[in-house]
Amino acid sequence: MPNEPIYHAHLKDFYAQLTRMLQGECDFSAAGVALYTTDASNYRQVPLGVVYPHTVDDLVNTATLCKTFSLPVLLRGGGTSQNGQGVNEAVVVDCSRYLTRVLDIDVENQTALVDPGVICDALKQH
């Protein structure tokens, strides 16, 4: 198709390599990406695919592979952005499914070490 970005030609190769190296899951189906076309804003963009990493290595491997294929990457949180940051024509990485641990809370220094999928409500419970 003439209007498709050039990186779409490499998407099948990217998907094949990604599924071989990923411990987590990924979904590049129309139904799977449809859930990530919107956030709390009025913007609508169809992602290239969605990755659900299980580990930090999954994050690193996904980012490295995206760089190799010159694919844009979007790390998505809760999809609550009202300015469109959570939607883009990119490989969306959703950490909210598996990377949700609160690893350490240091009350004295007012810091917390958390996985990237932790939401504020979960942190407040600790």
Residue ranges of model-derived segments:
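Noncatalytic alpha-helical scaffold of FAD-dependent oxidoreductases
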Residues: 1-126
